[in-house]
Amino acid sequence: LEQNQYVVTQQYTFQAGPVTKRADLVMLINGIPIVLIEAKTPVRSSQSWLDGALQVHDDYERNIPELFVPNAFSIATEGKEFRYGSIRMPVEFWGPWRLEDEAALPSIEEIGNAVNSMLRPNVVLDLLANFTSYATHKGKQRIKIIARYQQYEGTNKVVERVVAGHPKKGLIWHFQGSGKSLLMLFAARKLRLH
């Protein structure tokens, strides 16, 4: 973890053949672009995080796919909401990132907490190594799946309890449709590698 070099750069220019694109922010680990961040202005009510996500999904992913070979995930924000998703993930599946015990805060504080939590080097590397999978969307296109925040938190708590030998090691309760199957996939994978 400490031996890696982490840099976040503004206006990252990437060229693929004749096409050149400029992303707002990119997190590089050892010079490799791992996280792309598209930040829209918070003062224009006509723009939202969705505009940034669509720019990533419909423009960057299609026109400079080489940039997304090492990509762990992308982020879109306009300073009021924060959403993340992985390559080819439809934007309607992009989700927020927040700690489960985090109370709702004013927008800019919530964005700051999400950035400070999700973009810590240990979290980015953990997401990259243990919390990604692949699936086929609508029977055609392969997409990269990345854990939602509750799957990330839940998996790490399950692993922590199993390693510590607590009773009811893997017991966790979630609502229907919350991604329990993926949580178990991530937990099994992480436990196997532990």
Predicted features by range, described:
Residues 1-194:
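ATP-dependent helicase/translocase motor core
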